[in-house]
Structures are given as C-alpha cells and as structure tokens.
A protein has these predicted regions:
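Basic, low-complexity segments
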Residues: 1-19
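Anion-recognition interface
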Residues: 24
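Long, charge-rich, low-complexity alpha-helical segments
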Residues: 28-94
Length: 94
C-alpha cells in the first residue's frame, strides 16, 4: 500500500478498487474533488457531510488532486465512460 501527504492519502488494491483514497476511509480523492470542484462544497461543508473526515483529510485530498490532476481527471473520465456504457446497456423502461 502506498501512502502520501503525511499518511493521509493511500492507495491499496483492496480498498476503493485500488483508487487513491483518504487513509482509513472509503472516500476517494475523486469523491472529494467532485464535491469541491463540481458541486461547489467548501472543505468545511465536506466535513459536515462526512463527519468521519477531518479538515486536514479534505485538504490533503485536494492537495493530492492539485499535484496529480491528470491522474484524477483520467479516473473521472473512466468513471463517466463506465456510467455511460451502463446506461447504454441498461436503458430505462417504463
């Protein structure tokens, strides 16, 4: 398992599908990025929504993102493609 940002960010093949996450939690860096960058949540609001996280955890996740933007954006794109494929192969029926 690889750990960085003062032990707050980890990657393990058995946790979150091997995606980078906040150590000790099943919250991916990608989740924090979506909440912050796409839903407009402040770090304080994220901690309020996920009280098991600390403000330092959220800031570490954002710091990791800003240092590894391409990696996280590729994960985001892969998830979008996977969701689109699922919608295509499992259409809604009335």
């Amino acid at each position: 398992m690889a750990i960085s940002i003062e032990g707050r960010i980890a990657r393990s093949p058995n946790v979150c599908g091997g995606r980078v996450c906040i150590a000790g939690h099943r919250v991916r860096v990608l989740d924090v990025v979506v909440w912050h960058e796409h839903q407009g949540m402040s770090p304080d609001e994220i901690v309020t929504q996920v009280p098991s996280l600390t403000l330092a955890d959220v800031h570490a996740a954002l710091a990791y993102y800003f240092d590894h933007m391409e990696e996280i954006r590729e994960e985001m794109q892969a998830e979008r493609a996977q969701a689109e494929e699922f919608r295509r192969t499992h259409p809604l029926t009335a």
